[in-house]
């Protein structure tokens, strides 16, 4: 039960707090902007589905004792697939290696796990001390959490772009300008978002050079597909 609660907490916080903008971008791309994204509901529903997936995996493999937490491996793989998103998410022919990699890895895990269950049946039935049981499963869960964080989107500039885009779409132009305002890094896309927000606020002449302008006049416009391929 504690492992279940810890996984639920990690999944919800990771999706709702750290990868919220990535989930929104993925939703916008898949739904073509026709439905409204609900971040909290999405994080809760996904977490619930992942818990059900874990239950199904453990029902199939019967993982016990010190390796019980390994039943969360497919759930963590799904988290990686959902959050390993790059700038190509908005391209009409967007595709990701996770489309074939995720089912392949899950099938491999289930196959190997099913085989190992038969080989180590005696060891699995011997749970040992409670302290050792808890420590072993916590170590597995922590390792899976770290791997998931490393596998998800960690590009700070990309997150800034997505956050600015969210506020721009909502018409909250002041908030667009506060995204990454203390950072000296600024991608061309973020620079263009700031220019649009300043234009809408009628403050471009006053505040344009309050932000880094690494792209000169090109920073006022978004990159075209041909420019991205150079």
Show which residues each predicted segment covers.
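Membrane-anchoring hydrophobic segments
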Residues: 1-74
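Aromatic-anchored segments of alpha-helical transmembrane domains
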Residues: 10-17, 73-85, 143-148
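Alpha-helical transmembrane segments of polytopic membrane proteins
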Residues: 30-49, 95-109, 134-136, 162
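Membrane-interface anchoring determinants
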Residues: 59-62, 118-134
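Intrinsically disordered, low-complexity, charge-biased linker/tail regions
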Residues: 64, 76-77, 108-113, 213-228
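Membrane-embedded alpha-helical segments of integral membrane proteins
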Residues: 65-125
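Internal/C-terminal transmembrane anchor helices
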Residues: 129-155
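Soluble catalytic regions of membrane-associated enzymes that act on cell-envelope
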Residues: 152-230
